[in-house]
Amino acid sequence: MIETIASKLLVQNVSQYFILSFILLGIGLFGMMVRKNLITILMSLELALNSVNIAFVGIDRLNHLIDGEIFALFTIALAAAEAAVGLGIILSLFRLRKAENVNEIIDLKG
Amino acid sequence: MKALYPDIITTVGIIFLIILELFLPSFDLIGFLGFLISFISGVLAIKYSLAGYRFNEWLLDINAFSLFLKGVIYILTSFVIFSSVSFFKSKKTFLENVYTFLLISLGLSIMVSSKNLAVILSGLELASISMYISVGMLRDDYVSKEASFKYLVLGSMATAFFGIGSAFYIGATSHLGIISVSVNHNTAFALASLFLFIAFALKVSAAPFHFWTPDAYEGAPTSTTAFISTVPKIGFYAVIFLLASYIFPITNNFSYIVGIVGVISMFWGNLVAYAQNSAKRMLAYSSIGHAGYFLIGFSRYNPLSVSSTIFYVIVYAFATAGAFLVLSILEKNQSWTHDMNNYKALYKKSPFLAAALALFLFALIGIPPFATFVGKLGIFLGLVNSNAWFFAILFVIGSVIAAGYYLKLIVYMFFKEPVAEDNMSLSLNLFDTIGISAFLVAVFFFGIFPNVLFDIILKDMFHG
């Protein structure tokens, strides 16, 4: 019983992993460009980084490998470190100027 | 096993400094120990490189060339720490600055010591995350935090691209090592090389991906700019060299993408630099222009152009770090804003600093006695040898365009009348003088005797 449900839930076609991964990467990059709130930008960043993990898992299922999943573990740890640093910077920005939107942090004109 | 000693010394040293800082929060002590740790690791790495040690186990592949690069990275780090301690003291920045520099150099050193994409990623991110932190290290300074956030967002985008590129790479080749692979006309492999190239183009601030560069370099404390604009480039271009030797040549015409990004970067950086009023931003755009030169150098896998690009990156690091360090010494004066008008008649206030900055700028133009000329000449000859006349001619035009804005700053320093009611005093302590002189000597020495550096590069580079 459980096995049949599990086999139905598993993705049958490996290419669906890549499609999902690309959609998430696209949403992440799009969100980084259009969203104004700093925390939302950080969330979009995490989404883009995590889409990489899905692609790796899909490839490992396709090729019966393990390297990709280990790479995915690396990416998870890096995403956590990046989120920690990003939140720290947002906190200090907010503390110095009460800024929480991108249109408020335009002192430097790249 | 001995090949690992430089990294082990640095790692232990960083942990020791973090603990020591709790008990003895003194900039002089931490700075001196940081300098010492980094210098010892650097000298050891160069010594082992000349002895030809290698370590090829686990996922690491440390050969003589990567030991040489480690040595250059650590020695340059120690020079920058040596000459930036007094700046950090005058700006009252956080004490962590010293060991974030060491962490960045450790990350770069891990990055150059492996051919596995996962290990490269971990080293790259150790360096990058430490860089985001060190950009925002100026206490109570809003601009520094803003620059740090912008750098973080675009830098992490590069990480995402690196990850997706590695996913394609493992999909096409079933392994993560950057070694000779045989795949023909494989779309997944072409996408992998594209994404990996985009990730590194973002990190080295090549033109369509350069938007973080001027902001991050302007907002960071100036000695940190001296560090992040130079030392990481050595590590990044070492990885781009790996990609250029194993991955780029496989896809047809991929070298044109690298070359065209280089050309865009060169012209964009060098032309927009003319419009800048701030000397610090001007040097930031100059580094975008230089990213263009280096990518053009890697656009063909020709032994001459590739080895002279690595040579050029190293001597460019010395010249740019020196120029930014002169700026940092000037900035210790409270009213200094890096506006061009501040530089009027600098030679009257401080002949040494004005002369040093002028010499560094001449070096960046690439005028013969300086080492950068040798690098430029080598890239040009290599491009001509591999019949890439299009890129060779554009390379020369781009370099000539670049001369103008460096000369503009020199004209401001030597030939403009000083602004009235200007009574700023420039203090210059012994450490600053020694640090700047060391960079000057390096730029001159490698210009007059380029074979000292070039022989090591040529000996080790193609036998990895």
UniProtKB/Swiss-Prot annotation, chain A:
Gene Ontology BP terms: ATP synthesis coupled electron transport
One cellular component (GO) term of this entry: NADH dehydrogenase complex
Gene3D superfamilies tied to this protein: 1.10.287.3510
GO molecular function: NADH:ubiquinone reductase (non-electrogenic) activity; quinone binding
Alphabetical list of InterPro entries matching this protein: NADH_UbQ_OxRdtase_chain4L/K, NUOK/Mnh_C1-like
Cell compartments where the protein resides: Cell inner membrane
EC number: 7.1.1.-
Top-level taxonomic group: Bacteria
tRNA processing is among the record's keywords: no
Membrane topology: Multi-pass membrane protein
Keyword Translocase annotated: yes
Membrane-spanning segments: 14-34, 39-59, 70-90
Catalyzed reactions: a quinone + NADH + 5 H(+)(in) = a quinol + NAD(+) + 4 H(+)(out)
Assigned keywords, A-Z: Cell inner membrane, Cell membrane, Membrane, NAD, Quinone, Translocase, Transmembrane, Transmembrane helix, Transport, Ubiquinone
Free-text function comment from the UniProt entry: NDH-1 shuttles electrons from NADH, via FMN and iron-sulfur (Fe-S) centers, to quinones in the respiratory chain. The immediate electron acceptor for the enzyme in this species is believed to be ubiquinone. Couples the redox reaction to proton translocation (for every two electrons transferred, four hydrogen ions are translocated across the cytoplasmic membrane), and thus conserves the redox energy in a proton gradient.
UniProt-listed NCBIfam families: PRK05715.1-2
Quaternary context: NDH-1 is composed of 14 different subunits. Subunits NuoA, H, J, K, L, M, N constitute the membrane sector of the complex.
Family: Belongs to the complex I subunit 4L family.
Protein name per Swiss-Prot or TrEMBL: NADH-quinone oxidoreductase subunit K
Protein's gene: nuoK
